[in-house]
């Protein structure tokens, strides 16, 4: 009896179910089948207005390059990196699965586009500044710093 329960529990652990990705109540397969106009209706206002004005030639070229790289890659391979300076590009469903090198002003940060990134800007995934790491205060920084011994 106990072995059957153990076997049943082990079988349940093997069949782990993962949460299916949904963007505003629509799963990824349906997002990929949608036209751009239908997808635009799901976006927040700022991005919806941006896409309603139309994508520029550079943005359309980036989408085409990413799709070409995804098509050229093998079944279980990562596609080739597509480098871009377009930090203001909105991540669309057709970009999911691609690898994009996003320029941060110094280097290209490689980023694999995942479904959770849909609706964000590319620039949000390549930080353009080095976060401040506060060290010791310098001389004259505060009145109490007069009593801090020099190195």
UniProtKB/Swiss-Prot annotation:
GO terms for molecular function: RNA binding; structural constituent of ribosome. The modification N-acetylalanine is found at residue 2. GO terms for biological process: determination of adult lifespan; ribosomal small subunit assembly; translation. It comes from the Eukaryota. Belongs to the universal ribosomal protein uS19 family. PANTHER family: RIBOSOMAL PROTEIN S19P FAMILY MEMBER, SMALL RIBOSOMAL SUBUNIT PROTEIN US19. This is Small ribosomal subunit protein uS19. The gene is rps-15.
């Amino acid at each position: 009896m106990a072995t059957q329960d153990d076997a049943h529990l082990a079988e349940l652990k093997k069949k782990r179910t993962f949460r299916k990705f949904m963007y505003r109540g629509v799963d990824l397969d349906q997002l990929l089948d949608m036209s751009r106009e239908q997808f635009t209706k799901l976006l927040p206002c700022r991005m919806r207005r941006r896409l309603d004005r139309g994508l520029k030639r550079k943005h359309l070229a980036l989408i085409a390059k990413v799709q070409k790289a995804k098509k050229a890659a093998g079944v279980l391979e990562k596609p080739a990196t597509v480098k871009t300076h377009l930090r203001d590009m909105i991540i669309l469903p057709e970009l999911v699965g691609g690898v994009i090198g996003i320029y941060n002003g110094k280097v290209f940060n490689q980023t694999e586009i995942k479904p959770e990134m849909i609706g964000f800007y590319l620039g949000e995934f390549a930080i353009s500044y080095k976060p401040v790491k506060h060290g010791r205060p310098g001389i004259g920084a505060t009145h109490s710093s007069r009593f801090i011994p020099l190195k």
